[in-house]
Curated annotation (Swiss-Prot):
This is Trp operon repressor homolog. It is found in: Cytoplasm. One of its GO terms (molecular function) is DNA-binding transcription factor activity. Residues 59-82 bind DNA. Pfam families: Trp_repressor. One of its GO terms (cellular component) is cytoplasm. NCBIfam families: TrpR. Keywords: Cytoplasm, DNA-binding, Repressor, Transcription, Transcription regulation. Residues 79-89 have a biased composition (Basic and acidic residues). Belongs to the TrpR family. Residues 79-103 are annotated as: Disordered.
Length: 103
């Protein structure tokens, strides 16, 4: 009998991360699961989506600012284009919270 991996679907990984957040173990989990290069790539991807949602810079400018290839920006742009307006609004809310009103 062939053994199956415990985690075979993306949703299972998302559930694991959610559980780790609830237990305040998410930093440990994500650090353990991702190499430094993968964490750096994820930070770049978050910044790509953030900049694309802001819409103030061209893809070339984003590429230069973040030090990533234009193809990486294009992939992020294409993924964003495939999302519904509701999903884009939710992403914008996550990535661009309103400025704090603290004085």
């Amino acid at each position: 009998m062939v053994q199956q991996p415990s985690f075979s679907e993306w949703q299972q990984v998302l559930d694991l991360v959610k559980q780790a957040v609830q237990q305040e173990q998410h930093e440990m989990l994500l650090t353990m699961l991702m190499t430094p290069d993968e964490r750096e790539a994820l930070v770049a991807r978050v910044n790509i989506v953030h900049e694309l949602l802001q819409g103030e810079l061209s893809q070339r400018q984003i590429s230069q600012m973040l030090g990533v290839g234009i193809a990486t920006i294009t992939r992020g742009s294409n993924e964003l284009k495939s999302r519904s307006e509701d999903e884009k609004a939710a992403l914008a809310q996550l990535l661009m919270p309103p400025p704090s009103s603290e004085a």
